[in-house]
Amino acid sequence: VNHPAPPALARRPFPTELLDQLRSTFGERVSTSEAVRAHHGRDESPFDPQLPDAVVFAQSTGDIQTIVKLCARHGVPIIPYGNGSSLEGHLLAVQGGVSIDLSQMNRVLSINAEDLTVTVEPGISRKQLNEALRDTGLFFPIDPGADASIGGMTATRASGTNAVRYGTMRENVLGLSAVLADGRVVKTGTRARKSSAGYDLTRLFVGSEGTLGVITEITVRLYPQPEAVSAAVCAFPSMAEAVRTVIETIQIGVPIARVEFIDSLAVRAINKHSNLTLREKHTLFFEFHGTEAGVAEQAQLVQELAAQHGGEGFEWATRPEDRSRLWNARHNAYFAMLQLKPGCRAVTTDVCVPISRLAECVIETETDLKASPLPCPIVGHVGDGNFHVAILIDPDKPEEIDEAERLNRRIVQRAIAMDGTCTGEHGIGLHKMDFLVEEHGADTIDTMRAIKHALDPHNLMNPGKIFSWAA
């Protein structure tokens, strides 16, 4: 987990001539300072930093084309950088190269309220986008825990707490533009709600983790802001009863907007970090969207289901400030959990299974975690079968690294055996390449590799991620 890049990923040469060309073109928007490179060579993954040779702050698609063409001429890797919130090492420059910082490409290019779409640059964050939409009566619902960039969310096929109602980035990106490894720009998709025109290149780039090109524009779906919103918290006597409540809620068709599971250890961490007073038991957070009558009906149904499974009295959060406090605490759960073991790093699992197998998967995982000496809180978007274990390790203790790898492998292999996936929303990055092969098989990975070779024949686009260059 905490090992440097393997020898097969040796750094490539970074010619002085390339640096001179970048500086003559972009001036002060090029940095080789240790601090800037260090900031762009780490993320929220457990891996040691891997610094790029230089960072360039792009301001337009034309800038990115120029950077890519110069790097291609010299055979230097390119790593796109959004907000730095990856949990899988996507941003690490394992072969050196140029980090393209997209944070200054943060404009809303067009809002099409009648069509419920918006086109944005990749550096805008989800919070910035929703702030820009505030007066339109519309919102963009996908909300991973971090305030991630829309470009990064697209590149990792991200989702979040309300995917159970609104889907993931896969369902919500209608089209995009990307700069390929040779500097050409491709535009995929349209603003039409559907299309049967050719290969679905939009879906190819959504989840490509920067390995096929640099995404420069994204068109996403918007949704009307609901008339009524209500949130609630409910504690349960066991993990199994909490999860079964969720499964029954989904199976009877309640259109719940969010349902999050937080185990008792994670609740303790959240209480301390966010100054809450939740019962330190296995807990579900709910949110309901709709009309006043619809929300009341949904809440009543779910409350009855929870009571059948030992749920202890709903605590309601109907005021916007109370809901914000609750969901901010959930979104900060990762950092809260790190405080359970000061100085630790977290190896974070991301399995997702069919909802029919969720209870079995979570219960068997809980048994594994109870037998481990490591603290391992669990949180999850259980409404769509996705949950995360944060395995907290001391990176200086090899035995803890080994134990984390053992637990991680058991959790992933269990999910795959249940027709699930090794990653529901974080992506493959550096950490899950072996699991990708287990999940899909060698022939499927060879097909992915053939696409990569066709679009990026010199392996310049974020090399070392998703799968190895050679079979």
Where are these regions (language model features)?
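Alpha-helix capping/hinge segments and adjacent helical runs
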Residues: E28, I416-I428, H453, P457-M461
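C-terminal substrate-recognition/cap domain of FAD-linked oxidoreductases
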Residues: T32-G41, Y223-P224, S230, A235, ...
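FAD-binding subdomain of flavoenzyme oxidoreductases
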Residues: R107-E260
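Activity-critical C-terminal alpha-helical subdomain
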Residues: R184, M433-A471
